[in-house]
Every structure is written in C-alpha cells, then in structure tokens.
C-alpha cells in the first residue's frame, strides 16, 4: 500500500510526521499490509517544466516500482493500493483516476492502475468547494479551467476506477466534506465498490483516531479490505 503523506518542509517536521505515521504502520503490519511512504516533490516553477504534473509523476513512479519489484519485496503485485490524507488524498485520488494518462516512462507496459484507494479527509476537487491552498500550490492562483477540470478528480471516475474507502468529518472546516461525498456519489453512479464513513465531528487532521467518537476508522477499513478480498481475515 503506497501512502501519500503531505509535504515535508524541515527535518523536524519530517521526523514528526514519520512518527505520526507509526501507528498506521503498526496497524498495517497487524492486518498483513506493507506500507511504502512516498515523499513526493513539491510543485515548483523554478526547476520543473510543468510543476502541476510533478507529484503525479512521483505517484506513478511509486506504483511502477512497487509493481515491478513485487516479487523481490514479497508483495502481491495485484494488491497494490494507494492511501492519502488531506492533500495527499488529492494525489492519491489523482493517481486513481488518471492512471491511463501516464506521465513517466513505462518500458514494460506496466499497469499504473492502483488496485484500491483509501482516502482520509481528502482534497478531491479544485472546483468551488475544493481546497484553494492545494489548488494554488499545484496549478497556481490564476484560474485555468482545463487544469481545474483535470485535477477535479470526481469528474474522472468511470466503471474501472479502483474500489474506494473514504473517511471524513462533517464539520471539517479545512477540506469540506463535499469533497468525499461527491467523489463517493460518482463511484456509486459508476457501480464501483466504495464505502464512505462520515464522523459527526472531528474537524480536520484527526489521524488514526477521532477522539470525538468511539468508532475507530482503521477497524472499519480493515473490514472493508476483507470484504473486497484485499487482505485475509
């Protein structure tokens, strides 16, 4: 499972973020999931020809490496999924919906389609209800309708989209819950296996445990993965 975290800006923040992911690693190990963390490039006009595709290039390269090295790494190449939190959720959902638009070299004609997607309070859309900060960071403050459409991932779901598990809080003031709801609606319309869990409260960035609820979403995720034959009981 490739985990797309948000960007790391300093050594301190990198260590802090990696530590914050440890419970996820431990839980994954318990249920039989190996995690690969992707530290992807921050979009930058100074040294990238097209900064908007740099993160997607890194995501696709991560999927390529995982799939082509699956035997050596002891993983199932047909059960390689993606997981993203917040802005990392936008990258994960971009990889899940644009896997046929390959932005990297593919000498072995490897499939870039993830086998499943797990999105936790994700940025999905660059439309009116999307997250302006994520949009500006990726494509800039000047509105380009073609790019807004391209990176509004709810608009690119089809019947071949990977099965999806989503979690969001209704009172999320940073990334509106409409991101997950509209993505889920499109998954349903295209008859893609999907499950959405909405917390009444919790805001944004609650991580592995929403302290406002007795429900723990990692256990829900585990049951969903079992139902979809991703992991064993």
Per-segment meaning from a language model:
Residues 122-156, 162, 189:
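Mobile cap/lid helix-loop segments that gate and shape the active-site cleft of serine hydrolases
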Residues 1-27:
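Short, surface-exposed "cap/lid" segments of acyl-processing enzymes
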Residues 181-233:
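C-terminal catalytic histidine-bearing segment of alpha/beta-hydrolase fold enzymes
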Residues 160, 165-168, 172:
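Short beta-strand/loop motif that positions the catalytic acidic residue
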Residues 2, 61-131, 148-149:
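Primarily recognizes the serine-hydrolase "nucleophile elbow" in alpha/beta-hydrolase
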Residues 173-179:
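Conserved alpha/beta-hydrolase "acid-adjacent" motif
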Residues 17-18, 24-25, 36-77, 210-216:
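Catalytic nucleophile-loop/oxyanion-hole region of alpha/beta-hydrolase
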Residues 29-39, 81, 116, 195:
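A fold-wide structural signal in alpha/beta-hydrolase
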């Amino acid at each position: 499972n490739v985990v797309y975290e948000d960007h790391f800006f300093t050594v301190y923040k990198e260590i802090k973020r990696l530590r914050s992911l440890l419970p996820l690693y431990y839980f994954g190990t318990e249920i039989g999931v190996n995690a690969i963390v992707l530290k992807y490039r921050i979009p930058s006009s100074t040294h990238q020809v097209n900064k908007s595709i740099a993160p997607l290039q890194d995501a696709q390269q991560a999927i390529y490496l995982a799939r082509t090295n699956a035997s050596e790494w002891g993983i199932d190449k047909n059960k390689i999924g993606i997981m993203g939190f917040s802005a990392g959720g936008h990258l994960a959902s971009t990889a899940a919906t644009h896997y046929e638009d390959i932005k990297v070299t593919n000498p072995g004609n490897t499939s870039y389609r993830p086998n499943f997607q797990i999105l936790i309070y994700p940025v999905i859309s660059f439309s009116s209800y999307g997250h302006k900060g994520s949009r500006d960071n990726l494509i800039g403050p000047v509105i380009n309708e073609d790019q807004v459409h391209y990176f509004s991932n709810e608009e690119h779901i089809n019947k071949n989209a990977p099965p999806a598990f989503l979690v969001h809080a209704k009172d999320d003031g940073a990334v509106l819950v409409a991101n997950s709801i509209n993505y889920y609606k499109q998954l349903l319309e295209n008859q893609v296996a999907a499950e959405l869990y909405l917390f009444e409260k919790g805001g944004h960035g609650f991580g592995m445990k929403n302290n406002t609820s007795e429900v723990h979403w990692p256990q829900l995720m585990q049951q969903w993965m079992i139902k979809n034959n991703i992991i064993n009981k």
